[in-house]
């Protein structure tokens, strides 16, 4: 008795004529067998495409996984996103982040750079603070120097006034003044030039008209000396 296939067709001998419903049909193709062969061919092609995609580093598509019809057709989908069971990145963004992580600087270098930045900022702040302190100190010292100079000048003026008053109050002050003028005249002789003789003579005279120490009227002599000083005689 011949064996029957799942669709009720008797299984013929390999290479023999196909029989349908007990009737021999030489050259007639079984539609069920052709359909199964076509499905197997498509499944084999899909599996080959998935294999090539995985080798290229890509994840199999959602439609492709569902078309395969296997029990793990939806294993690669979670919360609307694809994931890959391997250790590699799932997409280009993950790959970029992975490269950045691998190429990122070590923790020690990052800490050293942060410490250097903080140290430079502290040095800049300290330099600005010291500069402000030096400027303030320099201004203060300059003001103190000007104050000391002014005080010394006032003291010098006061001492000079006291010395002048004491000199003129002492006896023979006029004589001392004449002697000093004569000494100055003698010192100028060596350095004199022609035509300045009367000018040197005028230095020895007191031309103050209000002087009360003069017992005689010397106004005429005073006028003569002044005229000779202004217009010396020509030899």
From Swiss-Prot:
Residues with the Phosphoserine modification: 104, 193, 223
Domain of life: Eukaryota
Lipid bilayer topology: Peripheral membrane protein
Main location: membrane
Keywords, ordered alphabetically: Acetylation, Calcium, Cell cycle, Cell division, Coated pit, Cytoplasm, Cytoplasmic vesicle, Cytoskeleton, Membrane, Mitosis, Phosphoprotein
Location of N6-acetyllysine modifications: 210, 229
Annotated region described as Disordered, given as residue ranges: 1-32
Pfam families: Clathrin_lg_ch
Compositionally biased region (Gly residues): 13-25
Cellular component GO terms, alphabetical: clathrin coat of coated pit; clathrin coat of trans-Golgi network vesicle; cytoplasmic vesicle; glutamatergic synapse; postsynaptic endocytic zone; spindle
Molecular-function GO term, any one: structural molecule activity
Swiss-Prot/TrEMBL GO biological process terms: cell division; intracellular protein transport; vesicle-mediated transport
Family to which the UniProt record says this protein belongs: Belongs to the clathrin light chain family.
Known partners and oligomeric status: Clathrin coats are formed from molecules containing 3 heavy chains and 3 light chains. Interacts with CALY; the interaction stimulates clathrin self-assembly and clathrin-mediated endocytosis. Interacts with CKAP5 and TACC3 forming the TACC3/ch-TOG/clathrin complex located at spindle inter-microtubules bridges; the complex implicates clathrin triskelions.
Function, in words: Clathrin is the major protein of the polyhedral coat of coated pits and vesicles. Acts as a component of the TACC3/ch-TOG/clathrin complex proposed to contribute to stabilization of kinetochore fibers of the mitotic spindle by acting as inter-microtubule bridge.
Protein name, per record: Clathrin light chain A
């Amino acid at each position: 008795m011949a064996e029957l296939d799942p669709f009720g067709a008797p299984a013929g001998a390999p290479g023999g004529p196909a029989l349908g419903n007990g009737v021999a049909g030489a050259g007639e193709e079984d539609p069920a067998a052709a359909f199964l062969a076509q499905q197997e061919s498509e499944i084999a092609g899909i599996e080959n495409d998935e294999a090539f995609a995985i080798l290229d580093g890509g994840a199999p598509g959602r439609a492709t996984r569902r078309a395969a019809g296997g029990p793990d057709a939806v294993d690669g989908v979670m919360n609307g996103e694809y994931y890959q069971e391997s250790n590699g990145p799932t997409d280009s963004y993950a790959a970029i982040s992975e490269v950045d992580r691998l190429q990122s600087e070590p923790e020690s270098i990052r800490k050293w750079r942060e410490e250097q930045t903080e140290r430079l900022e502290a040095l800049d702040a300290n330099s600005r603070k010291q500069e402000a302190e030096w400027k303030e100190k320099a201004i203060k010292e300059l003001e103190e120097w000007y104050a000391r100079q002014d005080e010394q000048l006032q003291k010098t003026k006061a001492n000079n006034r006291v010395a002048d008053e004491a000199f003129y109050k002492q006896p023979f002050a006029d004589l001392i003044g004449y002697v000093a003028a004569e000494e100055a005249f003698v010192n100028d002789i060596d350095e004199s030039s022609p035509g300045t003789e009367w000018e040197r003579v005028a230095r020895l005279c007191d031309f103050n008209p209000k002087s009360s120490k003069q017992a005689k009227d010397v106004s005429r002599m005073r006028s003569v000396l002044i005229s000779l000083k202004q217009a010396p005689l020509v030899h």
